[in-house]
Amino acid sequence: MAAKDVKFGSDARIKMLEGVNVLANAVKVTLGPKGRNVVLDKSFGAPTITKDGVSVAKEIELEDKFQNMGAQMVKEVASQANDAAGDGTTTATVLAQSIITEGLKAVAAGMNPMDLKRGIDKAVLAAVEELKTLSVPCADTKAIAQVGTISANSDENVGKLIAEAMDKVGRDGVITVEDGQGLQDELAVVEGMQFDRGYLSPYFINKQDTASVELDDPFILLVDKKVSNIREMLSVLEGVAKAGKPLVIIAEDVEGEALATLVVNTMRGIVKVAAVKAPGFGDRRKAMLQDIAILTAGTVISEEIGMELEKATLEELGRAKRIVITKENTTIIDGVGEAATIEARIAQIRQQIEESSSDYDKEKLQERVAKLAGGVAVIKVGATTEVEMKEKKARVEDALHATRAAVEEGVVAGGGVALVRAAAKLADLKGDNEDQTVGIRVALRAMESPLRQIVDNAGEEPSVVANRVREGEGNFGYNAATEVYGDMLEMGILDPTKVTRLALQFAASVAGLMITTECMITDAPKKDAPAMPDMGGMGGMGGMM
């Protein structure tokens, strides 16, 4: 077993604090509308330029192992804030640094670390309740746009695009961010249910200019197996031909004789048909076929429940106003399913989201909800260079997470004002003993640190602004972008309550652990083996005659 290096007490805490400061100082320069950029070197390609706190934190790895432990613990704060709310990473880091710095000063002055931690936890619990009372619902498009703008570092265009996307696909709709083709940001909305499976044969194409299949008022046959024998489908094909409607077949696969016969029928104009593979795999495919059935008021023909394709009737087929099939995607527009049944299905999937522990499963279930609820929006980010594209895309994703959080739990005054107001309300809070009360004071003082850092990054004097904001009431605060005091909500400077709450909770959680640390253990640095001794000089050859 390798030898260990062990540090105790203040020696350990000083080293840990040095690591915390290196990471936090690198991250906090990005906070606020006048926050600066950080340039990250890459082993290949151009460096990355970012104003995203968690991206900066993830890059930091220190040589000194004790300092590195401190840095990694604060990195955890930024990562947790990012995972839970998608934003607030820099705020969480600034709060953690402040609580740790003040807390370790109190420990050095002889306070009991465990009581300090209890005091900090007590203050944070009370502050969270206070934030909930300060919170205002984020209901209208204007408020959503403002939250998106603030989170995207005051980029109004991004805020407007996100608000427009939410307006079109609903609060539960899926909004994705992709690389755009031009210089402008664009929003593309896919109406109806879309899944990533295209036509099985190009001979089904009936719109040559767009290389797509477009069928109006079609029947939809949903089959949970491979179809290779045309005899199984004859009764359905005859019924559809008599009705004079087109048919879309969505099955695990359609191959061989069955596919060839469908192609021939289409080319001769006997019946308009298109075949598509069912989306997903395994159990997820079965669930998505069921979703399509509910959306189109059809039935999935499945041998598992004793149904046979040969006996399928027109009553078991789904219907939709229109279906568009391209090489890669199929879009079902205006399925005839009943609204109540679709709502019940959405509620059922939401229940599965609540119960699921896997992020991947949650994401896939959320996509299914969006497809049933009617739409997917794609924000295409435009930029001049690839470096700018990466930076901007990260900002748009942050803003998207922030707006979702705002819709979920409401908004509070931005610019660090909400935390200052919450701290002011708790000025008389006392602990069970003197040390706990000091812990409460440490947490309340730290709650001013985001406001001070925003002001500092804007080149103003933090103490002057903090005093002025403290004297004000309600949503009165300082707009660092315009250097104007006023009502933060009216100026459109909002932070999602969830983001502010989680930043404070995560920061206090990790800071509490660090304050109560008494010993740190790491691998001792390996001593280099002694170098090989020099070989004696080789004798030269004698002079040649």
Curated annotation (Swiss-Prot):
Entry keyword set? ATP-binding, Chaperone, Cytoplasm, Isomerase, Nucleotide-binding
Q: List locations, semicolon-separated.
A: Cytoplasm
Q: What reaction is this protein's catalytic activity?
A: ATP + H2O + a folded polypeptide = ADP + phosphate + an unfolded polypeptide
**Which residues are involved in binding ATP?**
30-33, 51, 87-91, 415, 479-481, 495
Recorded superkingdom: Bacteria
- What Gene3D superfamilies does the database record attribute to this sequence? GroEL, GroEL-like equatorial domain, TCP-1-like chaperonin intermediate domain
The record's principal subcellular location, in a coarse class, is cytoplasm
Enzyme Commission code(s) on record: 5.6.1.7
- Asked if the record carries the keyword NAD, the reply is no
Keyword Ribosomal protein carried by entry: no
Q: Which GO annotations describe the biological process of this protein? A: protein refolding
What molecular functions are annotated in GO for this chain?
A: ATP binding; ATP-dependent protein folding chaperone; isomerase activity; unfolded protein binding
An example GO CC term for this entry is:
cytoplasm
Q: Which family does it belong to?
A: Belongs to the chaperonin (HSP60) family.
- What is the protein's quaternary organization? Forms a cylinder of 14 subunits composed of two heptameric rings stacked back-to-back. Interacts with the co-chaperonin GroES.
- UniProt function note: Together with its co-chaperonin GroES, plays an essential role in assisting protein folding. The GroEL-GroES system forms a nano-cage that allows encapsulation of the non-native substrate proteins and provides a physical environment optimized to promote and accelerate protein folding.
Instruction: State the name under which the record lists this protein.
Output: Chaperonin GroEL
Native source species:
Tolumonas auensis (strain DSM 9187 / NBRC 110442 / TA 4)
Gene name tied to this protein: groEL
